[in-house]
UniProtKB/Swiss-Prot annotation:
InterPro entries: NADH_UbQ_OxRdtase_chain4L/K (IPR001133), NUOK/Mnh_C1-like (IPR039428)
Quaternary context: NDH-1 is composed of 14 different subunits. Subunits NuoA, H, J, K, L, M, N constitute the membrane sector of the complex.
NCBIfam families the UniProt entry points to: PRK05715.1-2, PRK05715.1-3, PRK05715.1-5
UniProt similarity note: Belongs to the complex I subunit 4L family.
Role according to the record: NDH-1 shuttles electrons from NADH, via FMN and iron-sulfur (Fe-S) centers, to quinones in the respiratory chain. The immediate electron acceptor for the enzyme in this species is believed to be a menaquinone. Couples the redox reaction to proton translocation (for every two electrons transferred, four hydrogen ions are translocated across the cytoplasmic membrane), and thus conserves the redox energy in a proton gradient.
GO biological process, one term: ATP synthesis coupled electron transport
Principal cellular location given in the protein's record: membrane
HAMAP family in alphabetical order: NDH1_NuoK
Phosphoprotein is among the record's keywords: no
Cellular component, GO annotation: NADH dehydrogenase complex; plasma membrane
Membrane-related topology note: Multi-pass membrane protein
Native organism: Chloroherpeton thalassium (strain ATCC 35110 / GB-78)
Protein's name in the database: NADH-quinone oxidoreductase subunit K
């Protein structure tokens, strides 16, 4: 039994939806960043699946660019979360109000 493109895309859609639900329902900044990374990994899975299905390496090269952007996003996001924790002593998004003077 061979795994077809539809199976990869279904798995990718499931992982992406799990990431979206994590972003929409969680209030912890670290969990939100992890959910965003989950969404990016779902996109990477789709790129690799299409690359394999079309016998083209362009999708696999795109994954490296997405991984680079994801690493930069994680580094900047984690730095922001650490800064907020040092100032507000919480990583809960509801308790952080930056617009309040």
């Amino acid at each position: 039994m061979e795994i077809e493109l539809g199976h990869y895309l279904a798995l990718s859609a499931f992982v992406f939806i799990c990431g979206v639900l994590g972003v929409l329902t969680r209030r912890n900044a670290i969990i939100i960043f992890m959910s965003i990374e989950l969404m990016l990994n779902a996109v990477n899975l789709s790129f690799v699946a299409f690359s394999h299905y079309l016998s083209d390496i362009a999708g696999q090269m795109m994954v490296f660019f997405v991984m680079t952007v994801a690493a930069a996003e994680a580094a900047v996001g984690l730095a922001i979360v650490i800064s907020l924790f040092r100032n507000k002593q919480t990583v809960n998004i509801d308790e952080i109000n930056l617009l309040k003077g």
